[in-house]
Regions:
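Outer-membrane beta-barrel channels and translocator barrels
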Residues: 12-16, 72-74, 112-116, 181-183, ...
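Transmembrane beta-barrel strands of outer-membrane/channel proteins
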Residues: 20-26, 79-85, 121-127, 188-194, ...
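Residues on the lipid-exposed face of transmembrane beta-strands in outer-membrane beta-barrel proteins
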Residues: 5-11, 63-69, 105-111, 174-180, ...
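Surface-exposed extracellular loop regions of Gram-negative outer-membrane beta-barrel proteins
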Residues: 68-92, 102-106, 187-202, 235-239
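Long, internal scaffold/assembly segments composed of regular secondary structure
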Residues: 159-250
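Residues that define the transmembrane beta-barrel architecture of outer-membrane proteins
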Residues: 1-5, 57-63, 97-103, 168-174, ...
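Surface-exposed loop/turn segments flanking beta-strands in extracellular/periplasmic regions
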Residues: 32-49, 139-157
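Outer-membrane beta-barrel translocator domains and adjoining extracellular loop/strand segments
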Residues: 1, 31-37, 89-96, 132-138, ...
């Protein structure tokens, strides 16, 4: 169940084009089991887990803004920034309180070839952090907390009551694009991203338990048509995504 609000903006100011987007989501996720960490898909397998789980509440904030500016008749420069914040919690044991911050910036340039063909390139940088804390107030029964390492395994030495962790990391990437100025005909995009995120157990003197490295390569090829009233098109997408994990030995 979710409630959300969404606002978009797009305008021309002189030669510049400015755009932005902001939205807010408030919702709940039911029947969560063996995961007490936010951003599951990004941080798997290095999650904090227990066998109880339950329903979690969440709030999600997103802000994005960018601009582009022509330099003569051939060149155009642009930049875009976005920030995502998320809070996830539960009001009964076990009680996670997760706060995430994800900041991303992108800078790019495009060049108009002969005719209507345009090529572009961009670089991206990213900063990520999550505090992942779990509280247990039941004095009669306390579940075992696991620090998962994938394939049904966990780091046995840290199993128990180490319930305060955080994740921090960075990402870098690049993008190449091809399109036509009138937004008709063929278009293509190739994108690469590398991320490096550390999992740190706060309750063990900031112990660096593991490092997760991931690479993603994405390609899109498509074709657009315009009959004067609306656009029609089709595209083909492909993704190659790999993760590499390193668990430190203590």
């Amino acid at each position: 169940s979710r409630v959300f609000a969404d606002v978009d903006a797009y305008l021309h100011k002189g030669k510049a084009t400015i755009w932005g987007n902001a939205y807010y989501v408030n919702g709940r996720t039911h029947n969560v089991c063996y995961n007490e960490t936010t951003d599951f898909e990004q941080l798997y397998p290095y999650l904090m887990a227990d066998s109880v789980g339950g329903k979690t509440s969440q709030e999600y904030y997103y802000f994005m803004g960018g601009f582009s500016y022509p330099l003569g008749k051939k060149w155009t420069i642009g930049a875009e920034g976005e920030y995502t914040a998320r809070m996830e919690y539960r009001t009964r044991d076990p009680r996670p309180k997760n706060l995430t911050g994800d900041l991303c910036a992108k800078v790019g340039v495009s060049y108009l070839l002969s005719g209507l063909h345009s090529i572009g390139a961009a670089v991206t940088a990213r900063k990520y952090k999550q505090t992942n804390e779990l509280k247990l107030y039941n004095e009669v029964s306390v579940p075992t907390i696991y620090h998962l390492t994938g394939l049904g395994n966990d780091y046995y030495r840290f199993r128990g009551v180490n319930t305060s962790t955080y994740y921090k990391g960075y990402g870098v990437g690049g993008m190449l694009t091809y399109s036509q100025k009138d937004q008709k005909g063929w278009f293509a995009q190739a994108e690469y991203e590398y991320t490096n995120i550390d999992k740190i157990i706060s309750t063990l003197n900031e112990l660096p338990m593991a490092t997760l490295e991931s690479t993603r390569f994405h390609v899109t090829v498509g074709y657009l048509m315009n009959d004067g009233h609306q656009y029609y098109g089709a595209n083909l997408d492909g993704d190659i995504y790999r993760k590499f994990g390193t668990e430190n030995i203590f």
